[in-house]
């Protein structure tokens, strides 16, 4: 199969991003992730398969509409007390409710698309990439959780002279990362915690493979621009020892940068849309600590 014909499951294409790589970029979000971080801002990305979601803030209300319940052939969507209710155990994934919904309250996260389809959308903004040094960033979920599709996207983008970056959690076979780095222009790599037991308790996997993979990048792709990022999560890795320990293991080179990211809850509403509970309810970032931490991190840049 030609690279441009390869297909994968994508849940969002976001244009005009300026925070996920150099210049103005188009972000392509792929479904699936080997980690299950309770602070994840894209919970709809974690499972590989498409997922049905309901956003009540966009609903026209059962009194005005109710088309989703009428369209559902299994009774998974119903009207109870004037409210739209969803029984996931009865849902067969036919998406009749989604097609019937006029407001977008009923939706599906995840759609099968080809490399050609994705890059056609990416290329629409080619003039912005040229002027800003931007391009394509693969994200997720995990950008390499669908390795065949992701690698085909990167190779085909390279043929079309599109600057490429991936955002990655680093947990997959080293050979996959090696293949990606051979065609990447830059890499954004998360390191959340050096303590493997603590990492596994929080995310579901240990940190050994992640650290092995970033070590592989440092050794075999020494000139690749790399941004290492750590989300600072209260109660998980919010100590000077944790963050400075990660910074210490990163080579001090001009092409390697490090960022500690402040915890936020911008993705919290989506947990409700998916029928899940947000486990960090009420948790807030310590702004004073982050300010002190960033002052300390600046000393590594000298």
Swiss-Prot record:
Q: Where does [4Fe-4S] cluster 2 bind?
A: 59, 65, 68, 101
Q: So which domain of life are we looking at?
A: Bacteria
| Residue pairs linked by disulfide bridges in the UniProt entry | none
| Pfam family, any one | Fer4_12
Chain positions recorded as [4Fe-4S] cluster 1 binding sites: 33, 37, 40
Q: Residues that bind [4Fe-4S] cluster 3, according to the entry?
A: 72, 91, 94, 97
Residues the record lists as binding S-adenosyl-L-methionine = 39-41, 141, 190-192
Catalytic reactions of this protein: glycyl-[protein] + reduced [flavodoxin] + S-adenosyl-L-methionine = glycin-2-yl radical-[protein] + semiquinone [flavodoxin] + 5'-deoxyadenosine + L-methionine + H(+)
Its cofactor is: [4Fe-4S] cluster
Ranges of residues in domain Radical SAM core: 19-301
The record's listing under InterPro entries reads: 4Fe4S_Fe-S-bd, 4Fe4S_Fe_S_CS, Aldolase_TIM, BssD/PflA/YjjW, Organic_radical-activating, Organic_radical_activase, Radical_activat_CS, rSAM
Q: Which family does it belong to?
A: Belongs to the organic radical-activating enzymes family.
PANTHER family of this UniProt entry? PYRUVATE FORMATE-LYASE 2-ACTIVATING ENZYME, PYRUVATE FORMATE-LYASE-ACTIVATING ENZYME
Q: What is this protein called?
A: (2S)-3-sulfopropanediol sulfolyase activating enzyme
Q: Which organism is it from?
A: Bilophila wadsworthia (strain 3_1_6)
Gene that produces this protein: hpsH
């Amino acid at each position: 199969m030609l690279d441009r014909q390869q297909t994968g499951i994508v849940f969002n294409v976001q244009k005009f991003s300026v925070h996920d790589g150099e210049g103005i970029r188009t972000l392509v979000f792929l479904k699936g992730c080997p980690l299950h971080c309770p602070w994840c801002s894209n919970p709809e990305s974690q499972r590989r398969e498409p997922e049905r979601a309901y956003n009540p803030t966009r609903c026209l209300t059962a009194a005005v509409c109710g088309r989703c319940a009428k369209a559902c052939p299994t009774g998974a969507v119903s009207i109870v007390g004037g409210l739209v209710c969803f029984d996931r155990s009865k849902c067969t994934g036919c998406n009749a409710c989604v097609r019937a919904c006029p407001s977008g309250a009923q939706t599906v996260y995840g759609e099968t698309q080809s490399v050609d389809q994705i890059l056609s959308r990416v290329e629409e903004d080619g003039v912005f990439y040229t002027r800003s040094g931007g391009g394509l960033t693969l994200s997720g979920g995990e950008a390499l959780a669908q390795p065949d599709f992701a690698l085909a996207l990167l190779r085909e983008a390279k043929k079309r002279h599109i600057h490429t970056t991936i955002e990655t959690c680093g947990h997959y076979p080293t050979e996959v990362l090696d293949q990606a780095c051979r065609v990447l222009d830059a890499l954004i790599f998360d390191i959340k915690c050096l303590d493997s037991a603590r990492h596994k308790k929080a995310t579901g996997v240990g940190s050994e493979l992640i650290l092995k993979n970033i070590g592989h990048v440092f050794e075999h792709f020494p000139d690749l621009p790399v941004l290492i990022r750590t989300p600072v999560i209260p109660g998980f890795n919010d100590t000077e020892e944790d963050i400075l320990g990660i910074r210490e293991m990163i080579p001090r080179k001009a092409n390697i940068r490090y960022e500690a990211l402040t915890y936020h809850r911008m993705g919290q509403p989506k947990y409700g849309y998916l029928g899940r509970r947000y486990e960090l309810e009420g948790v807030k970032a310590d702004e004073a600590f982050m300010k002190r931490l960033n002052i300390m991190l600046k000393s590594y840049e000298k």
